[in-house]
Amino acid sequence: MPKAKISALGCYTPPRVLTNQDLEKLVDTNDQWIMERTGIRERHIAAPEMATSDMAIEAARCALLQRGIDACEIDAIILCTVTPDHLFPSTACLVQNAIGAKGAWGFDLIAACSGFLYGLTTGAHFVMAGTHKKVLVIGSDTMSRIIDYTDRATCVLFGDGAGAMLIEATDEADDGTGFIDFLGEIDGSGGEFLRMPAGGSRRPASHETVDQRMHYVHQEGSQVFKYASRKMYEVCRDLLERNHFKVEDVGLMIPHQANKRIIKAAGDRLGIAPERVMINIERYGNTTAGTLPLATRDAISEGRLKKGDLVLFAAVGAGYTVGASLWRWAF
């Protein structure tokens, strides 16, 4: 069976930066309040003319450039997002056309903040099945389009950004790098605690839904915090145990960047040293499907992630969706 490895990485964030001081002018909040509760200092915001596909295209091109391959070599595109350009056609189709990935197939994957992690796992299994040689997994979200900037509880949390990873087959059997295992679960009983109430078939767009601001993110923060910090710890613990690894074996844990307090709580319960937990939420906020590739890029640039390291990705998102995966880093 072929091995699946991550062979390239590309990211994109819009140039505009929205600071906590900027938010002080919009809602009743301040830098200290935001930093203490979230760990976020600033976030990037897409220009009005920029959509999710535009950021995804930039990230995809960066990944292809890093790998030095043509888009025609891509077999499949998995586009992870909760903010597609349209309900249909899929954003994956728009990206495929723009980058010239002729012959590729693909789809959009909606799993909120766990989306990119689920996409990585799906892509890895396509490769390991022997049916695909190269799968491009992209996480891209323009969360600013579904955020209520009169709600201080949510508007401080989110930013816009995108990242792409190329997964490909490798015959380097003795290299030891690549995908190891994944563990995930969903729990629909928590769906009401983090959601966008309208815009789907349950509550299609109407004057009423717009007037009631139902097309924005609604969150019950305390419920999400308790669940996320507990489940992130549990899924990481169980995945390590299943593969006979100790916490000390992990070179770097790269968690979804939702809230610094959630990450710290999960890491403390897991017993992993803080210096082996990647946190970059201060600069980007929660970019939903973009957080894992953005955090991975920064880890590499800071010299915290090197070839051969055991990497533990973890995420908890709306739904609820939960997951963790282990990889031996390949570059």
Swiss-Prot record:
Pathway: Lipid metabolism; fatty acid biosynthesis. One of its GO terms (cellular component) is cytoplasm. It comes from Solibacter usitatus (strain Ellin6076). It comes from the Bacteria. Homodimer. This is Beta-ketoacyl-[acyl-carrier-protein] synthase III. It is found in: Cytoplasm. GO terms for molecular function: 3-oxoacyl-[acyl-carrier-protein] synthase activity; beta-ketoacyl-acyl-carrier-protein synthase III activity. It holds the Pfam family ACP_syn_III_C. The keyword Acyltransferase applies. One of its GO terms (biological process) is fatty acid biosynthetic process. Residues 257-261 are annotated as: ACP-binding. Belongs to the thiolase-like superfamily. FabH family. The last Arg residue of the ACP-binding site is essential for the weak association between ACP/AcpP and FabH. InterPro entries: ACP_syn_III_C, ACP_syn_III_N, FabH, Thiolase-like. It is an enzyme of class 2 (transferase). It catalyses: malonyl-[ACP] + acetyl-CoA + H(+) = 3-oxobutanoyl-[ACP] + CO2 + CoA. Catalyzes the condensation reaction of fatty acid synthesis by the addition to an acyl acceptor of two carbons from malonyl-ACP. Catalyzes the first condensation reaction which initiates fatty acid synthesis and may therefore play a role in governing the total rate of fatty acid production. Possesses both acetoacetyl-ACP synthase and acetyl transacylase activities. Its substrate specificity determines the biosynthesis of branched-chain and/or straight-chain of fatty acids. The active site is at 113, 256, 286. Keywords: Acyltransferase, Cytoplasm, Fatty acid biosynthesis, Fatty acid metabolism, Lipid biosynthesis, Lipid metabolism, Multifunctional enzyme, Transferase. PANTHER family: 3-OXOACYL-[ACYL-CARRIER-PROTEIN] SYNTHASE 3 (PTHR34069), BETA-KETOACYL-[ACYL-CARRIER-PROTEIN] SYNTHASE III (PTHR34069:SF2). The gene is fabH. Its EC number is 2.3.1.180.
